[in-house]
Amino acid sequence: TENEKAVMHIFSGRQQTVLSSVTSELKGASPAAFGSLGEEDQDYFTYIINQLKEKKILLQKSIDKTDEVYQEWQSGTISAQEYLNHAIAQNWIDITQFTIDEKYSDSTEIYDALCDYIMDDIATDTGFSKIIYEYLIKAGSVSGKQLCLILYDQGVLAYDAEEISSLESNAVSPVSFLKDKIKNIEITPAQLALDPCSGSCVITDVKTGELLALVSYP
């Protein structure tokens, strides 16, 4: 739909800007200390480092927590570039996870290969894209109305001409719209990645075993 195309156009433009910024921090001559980055950029690099850990590229068990550079990274006084280069030098990085045919022996080549891996990964990573969308929404670049209408465009909600018209004319706010859909379980917490996604509770009389209450969601 036109609405989907408009949102994707906004996202694609912002994504290219973000990827360029990440590349500059990883490969540029003057990378910024993590602590001096804005909240958005910190979120991107926190995600990148966490992904390297989860994929066992940055080996948590190998990291020396007393290492001076590691502690500087934890305190935000050095850049991701410096931290990752140091991690390579200290053998905290498993290079077999991202090198293919060529045997890398030079630390610069290893770092370049790691950067290429990171950039290829985040360019298609859903979790990373969600962070971009989060800040687009916070900045108002993508509106709540657009997101609500996309729920119809993508079949998450059954087509309802009256409700769509209300959204388009601003007769109903996106917040009120979503609250109503969640209340009626047309949209579940699980779809919004909210906890609890499901749950149940059973209350009995401990003396008699009598069932007093039973409830579940959804």
Q: Which residues fall in each region the model found?
A:
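Periplasmic/cell-envelope proteins involved in peptidoglycan metabolism and beta-lactam response
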Residues: 1-218
